[in-house]
Amino acid sequence: MKAFYGILIIFILISMIHLSQQVFINATCTVTSQCRPKCIEAIGQAASKCINRKCKCYP
């Protein structure tokens, strides 16, 4: 059982590190498809979301 909790803690820490790499850019949007070209221009990756009318890019 201790090994399970250890693996769970490691998984949570790795997830937090990965999620902290998200980048908000100062681009307004209404749908996610509007963010893709802006994220490609800003960080070189197309992974994006439109959240609260702001583009969020994922490297």
Swiss-Prot record:
Superkingdom field: Eukaryota
Residues marked Basic residue of the functional dyad (site): K49
Organism whose genome encodes this protein: Tityus serrulatus (Brazilian scorpion)
Location (main, coarse): secreted
Family assignment from sequence similarity: Belongs to the short scorpion toxin superfamily. Potassium channel inhibitor family. Alpha-KTx 04 subfamily.
Listed InterPro entries: Scorpion_toxin-like_sf, Scorpion_toxinS_K_inh
GO MF entries: ion channel inhibitor activity; potassium channel regulator activity; toxin activity
Expressed in which tissues: Expressed by the venom gland.
GO cellular component: extracellular region
Keywords on record: Disulfide bond, Ion channel impairing toxin, Neurotoxin, Potassium channel impairing toxin, Secreted, Signal, Toxin, Voltage-gated potassium channel impairing toxin
Disulfide bonds listed in the record: C29-C50, C35-C55, C39-C57
Site (Aromatic residue of the functional dyad): residue numbering on this chain: Y58
Protein's UniProt name: Putative potassium channel toxin Ts25
Domain characteristics, as noted in the entry: Has the structural arrangement of an alpha-helix connected to a beta-sheet by disulfide bonds (CSalpha/beta).
Function in brief: Potently blocks Kv1.1/KCNA1 (85%), Kv1.2/KCNA2 (91%), Kv1.3/KCNA3 (89%), Kv1.6/KCNA6 (94%), and Shaker (97%).
UniProt-annotated location(s): Secreted
Pfam families the record matches: Toxin_2
N-terminal signal peptide: 1-22
